[in-house]
Amino acid sequence: CRNQEITSWSIKTSKGSIQESHQDALGHKIYNIFNSNLKGSQKITSSGIVNTKDMLGIVKGLQEKVNPECFLRQTNLTLPCRKILKLSKNLKRKNNDTITFCHQINEIVSKSIKYVSGSTSVSTSAKKSIEQGKGVCQDFAHILISLARENSLPARYINGFLIEDLNAQEHTTHAWTEIYVDDLGWVAFDPSHNKCIDEKYVRISCGLDFLDASTIKGVKTNYSGSDCLLYTSDAADEWLRGGL
């Protein structure tokens, strides 16, 4: 998209081979990694440099072939509960002003739970996080998605990076929400920070929810052993370091 420009990108694996497969209907580049040696661990490293721009939250230049209405469908992670439905009970779109309504529900969701690191897992639903009153960025995103879809607004989960503190030594993955607004297209809201995204965000993938937007998925054949996935990430601001 025009919000960001990839100047370099590479994917490496400690075992097996990597093949670029195709570009899916949402514009994601798909790579296949084949590994017949299942003993021990496998390390996959993806790295690159991305130039970003502040587009006031509007995501421009997406290469997609998917009707936005596909993102009206709720999933097990976004199904609304009574508490979620109550969040916008008294809200109405005045004069069909959808963008103002989106800002309102984003602010409401930002206050609906407290951010508590490690309080939920990747399988935690919007219902569970709002009932316990705490969560992490993915939970804020799921609640906003649930609320937007309940109000007939297509919404989707975004997986990416946020350089929140330019002086921090490490930066990890982040999650936010895109809501489709007529005449504007997809607009990105970060309910965990109660704002639209800016140049500090790097967009990686999108989907119906966390699971659908996952960047790594695997298939096992003729294998009965156990498996686990450990994921680490780091994003750095090159401008701060004098690189751009």
Report residues per predicted region:
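Intrinsically disordered, low-complexity N-terminal segments that are enriched in acidic
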Residues: 1-55
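Short, surface-exposed linear segments at secondary-structure transitions and domain or protein termini
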Residues: 17-19, 68-70, 196-203
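Acidic low-complexity segments
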Residues: 43-116, 125-131
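A structural signal for short, well-ordered beta-strand segments
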Residues: 46-48, 177, 233
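A mid-sequence, solvent-exposed acidic-amphipathic segment
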Residues: 104-157
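Hydrophobic/aromatic-rich core segments of domains that either
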Residues: 139-224
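Conserved small/polar residues in nucleotide/adenosyl-binding loops
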Residues: 231-238
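Hydrophobic alpha-helical segments, chiefly the membrane-spanning helices
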Residues: 242-244
